[in-house]
A protein has these predicted regions:
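Asp-based, Mg2+/Mn2+-dependent phosphohydrolase catalytic module
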Residues: 1-5, 79, 102, 106, ...
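N-terminal helical cap/lid subdomain that shapes the substrate entry/recognition surface
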Residues: 2-99, 109, 120
Length: 224
């Protein structure tokens, strides 16, 4: 029986599509390197972002700015990354919940729920507040000083919920950060595959796969 649900934030309940990042990449190219493909620049930025060394904890804002600085340097662009990060954060703060989220959360009323997100504390709470979304527990990578899929961030949520992992289902869009991370602790998992990608050989296997959150109340009801 599912006694609690933990949710990833971005890509799961909050829509922060790639278009925001490509918008910033276009601004960089237009202002400093006409002719540079914004997608190629964003791929380079992504490479530094996802390849960041997280042994020494940095906030998500710090990782984002540092990875942008490295991408700028790789292309020989002498520009301060900070103004672009400010613009990016301003756009992200306008992010909205996916259309089905409020209906789904209402249908799950009575089940304790938490957000477990690779995000900075004030940033995430501001977005949740603007979208009028309330959760019993909000755990961020900043408050945990650890990023998913590391166990600590999930452990803090479980401790706050006071429910054993076997009775908690985690819902997220990342096979590695969400599905693998939660599964290692014995939590059940629901993969939100909004883009319809196919899992590759060796990818983590969720207990359930859904296209969006619409079916989540029924999924939760059916899980043993």
């Amino acid at each position: 029986m599912v006694r609690a649900i933990t949710f990833d934030a971005f890509g799961t309940i909050i829509d922060t599509g790639r278009e925001v990042l490509i918008h910033i990449a276009r601004e960089v190219c237009a202002e400093h390197r006409a002719g540079l493909d914004p997608e190629a620049f964003l791929d380079t930025w992504d490479r530094y972002f996802f390849g960041a060394d997280t042994e020494q904890f940095l906030t998500l804002a710090e990782v984002t700015e540092d990875s942008l600085a490295k991408a700028l340097h790789e292309y020989g662009i002498e520009a301060d990354p900070r103004p672009y990060i400010d613009r990016l954060e301003a756009l992200w703060l306008k992010a909205k919940a996916y259309p089905e989220v409020r209906t789904v959360l209402a249908a799950l009323d009575g089940i304790p729920r938490a957000v477990v997100s690779n995000a900075d504390d004030a940033f995430l709470k501001g977005i949740l507040r603007r979208n009028r979304l309330t959760f019993d527990v909000v755990i961020t990578s900043e408050s945990a000083q650890a990023y998913k899929p590391r166990p600590r961030i999930f452990e803090l949520a479980l401790k706050a919920l006071r429910i054993p992992p076997a009775d908690v289902v985690h819902v997220g869009d990342s096979l590695e950060a969400d599905i693998a991370g939660a599964s290692r602790l014995g939590m059940r998992t629901v993969w939100v595959n909004r883009s319809g990608v196919r899992r590759g050989p060796g990818d983590p296997t969720p207990d359930v796969e859904v296209r969006d959150l619409s079916d989540l109340p029924e999924v939760v009801r059916r899980l043993p």
